[in-house]
Swiss-Prot record:
Any one GO molecular function term: 2 iron, 2 sulfur cluster binding
GO biological process terms held by the UniProt record: iron-sulfur cluster assembly
Name the record gives this protein: Iron-sulfur cluster insertion protein ErpA
Keywords: Iron, Iron-sulfur, Metal-binding
Coiled-coil regions listed in the entry: none
Keyword presence, Signal: no
Organism, scientific name: Legionella pneumophila (strain Lens)
Family statement drawn from the similarity comment of this UniProt entry: Belongs to the HesB/IscA family.
Superkingdom of origin: Bacteria
The record's free-text note on cofactor binding: Binds 1 iron-sulfur cluster per subunit.
Gene assigned in the entry: erpA
Binding residue positions for iron-sulfur cluster: 46, 116, 118
Cofactor(s) recorded in Swiss-Prot or TrEMBL: iron-sulfur cluster
Subunit composition and interactions: Homodimer.
Amino acid sequence: MASVDVSQNTSDINFSVSAADKVAELIKEEDNSDLNLRVSITGGGCSGFQYGFSFDEQINDDDTVIIQQCSDGKSSVKLLIDSMSYQYLHDAEIDYIKGIQGEQFVIRNPNAKTTCGCGSSFSIGDEDDL
């Protein structure tokens, strides 16, 4: 398992403080401090790949663990990304936004060559670009 602490800017994936705050809020609602946010990429969607968000207590051997401190300065949360998904998320930003269309987790992924209107499906160019 690779462990990366984004508070020390050692990760090539940006897990925002606003995303960490929302994850902490959701974990508190579930009343299970062992939960971590897992981001994954699977085949499917209208553009070829799709993002998945889930909570997971299990940290697998091939997971990259990104730790982000919350805005309160006291608590932190963990983001888990499996090795297959990690290669497609290089230099991406995982954020939580509030806007006119509601609230949602978003991934700004520079590796995505095209995205669909829903924002949860994307395609990549040549795998050599990764």
